[in-house]
């Protein structure tokens, strides 16, 4: 639920807020339509892939007996799509590059970038551990269901920083960057985080994470 909530929160709520506040300050905002088209296409493919195991189980097809193998194959397909998207992104888009040149911001060195990412990753690990420990008592005291906590609370809190950055970029009239940050966040969860967690759950044992979702989550995802 938290993964699906993160995808929906970025794609609907945060993108809507960014467009609202960006338009409120700057009026009509224009952006290059090609990168969003690519992201939307990949999201449609990812959604179709995520729905397959659920349909196989709910419709009681012969594939239901091979959900484990199906999950692994679909996870690999999603990771291949992510790799292809990263390759395209690294090549860069001329319109976005032009916008970056107009802003005139200095670029970070590779060493500084790696150090900052490593520090952010370590900090995120500690914060996540604290957040999980604090969430369970809060759910019990406030009467929050697991579905609501996953779809709303964890999804919004887990992506709070990048969500604020996307809205801030739209406020500064950098629409290309804003849309890229927000939409790519959802895409990375669908194509990267979800399949990696599924594969790790099978490798490490214990609780198994599968692509089989509840009918409600499937309906929400398709909408």
Question: What is each PLM-predicted segment?
Answer:
Residues 1, 126-148, 155:
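Membrane-embedded alpha-helical segments and adjacent helix-loop junctions characteristic
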Residues 1, 21-37, 140-148, 169-179, ...:
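Juxtamembrane helix-boundary/capping and inter-helix hinge elements in multi-pass membrane proteins
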Residues 2-12, 35-43, 151-159, 181-189:
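Transmembrane helix-bundle signature of multi-pass membrane transporters/permeases
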Residues 11-133, 142, 207-223:
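Alpha-helical transmembrane bundles of multi-pass secondary active transporters
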Residues 14-18, 157-167:
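Short helical (or helix-break) motifs at transmembrane helix termini and adjacent helical loops
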Residues 23, 134-138, 163-167:
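Membrane-spanning helices that line or support transport/gating and their immediate boundary helices
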Residues 116-121, 147-151, 180:
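Short alpha-helical transmembrane interface motifs in multi-pass membrane proteins
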Residues 168, 175-223:
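C-terminal transmembrane helix pair
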